[in-house]
Amino acid sequence: MAFRHQIVIIAQPVGKMKSPPGADCSKTRRFLQARGALAFAVKLRYNVGAKGGNGEMETRQTKQTSAGRRAALVLAALLLLALLLCALTMTRVYPAMPEALQVLERPADGVTVRRGAERIDFIPAHPQAGLAFYPGAMVQFEAYAPLMERLAVRGVLCVLLRMPGNLAVLNPDVADGVQADYPEITRWFLGGHSLGGAVAANYLEKHGGEYDGLLLLAAYSVADLSGEQLRVLTVYGSEDGLLERDRLESGRALLPADAEEVVLPGGCHACFGSYGAQPGDGVPTITRAQQQEQTADLAAAFCLENAA
């Protein structure tokens, strides 16, 4: 009886995501390409068959060939791992600014901050709507604390979600179960910044009936939500140097017909969060605080209107 080993390497794609939106993306592409190459599957199949009636032993040459294939497979895996580590080294993580971390220690009056291992909740005294938020790629998620606090002051309970490796694509279903923790809130929205917004939109392609709307900050959808019963608000700055305008344009056709879009005069890509400047972004003509205040006004009005 002979055993024949067949080793098949299958490259697995990262997912259905197209080029992620915004600035986080240029540095993230190397990571995603390396990750896609590394995420391979090895199938080892043992084919058992009788050859006549005398039992056939594997020849020395076959053994050597199998050993050579295994060695080549191990070498390929090591090379791919080295490529991934190199990509990670080249990818910068944007840390939260001190002002963002201070919000977590001393939130505004009427706002309670509840910190968990995988998320931070910003809870108003009388929440009227809920927002689960996906941060941008390679940004320390605490950097969005000032914006979340501003929304909570306006009556929107915000759940800021932590992403593994600071990449939403590595855990796109992180919003699962968020609503169950606050059963008293009956209207929920999903939002995200840049790549986080695109991943949030992808999530709603499968979970659209669970949310009332989508908030896209400097982001566009690559998922077809045109047939969903969702309200959508897109907000971006006039000086954003990282949001791909052609993708934004083509993404409009994927949104419901009544989707809203607002341009913040003088706003940039990075100032939705509090993590400093990003290479390639435009020069804002308004302050970070002003951009976040205007965004909070728009987002709160959007959520609370739909929660009425």
Roles of regions detected by a PLM:
Residues L147, L243-A253:
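Short alpha-helix in the alpha/beta-hydrolase fold that links the catalytic acid
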Residues G251-A308:
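C-terminal catalytic-base region of ester-bond hydrolases, centering on the histidine
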Residues E210-A219:
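A conserved short beta-strand
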Residues T234-Y236:
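Short beta-strand/loop motif that positions the catalytic acidic residue
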Residues Q128-G136:
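Short beta-strand element of the alpha/beta-hydrolase
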Residues M148-A168:
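Conserved alpha/beta-hydrolase
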Residues G192-A200:
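Gly/Ala-rich beta-loop-alpha elbow adjacent to hydrolase catalytic centers
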Residues M57-G110:
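N-terminal membrane-anchoring alpha-helices
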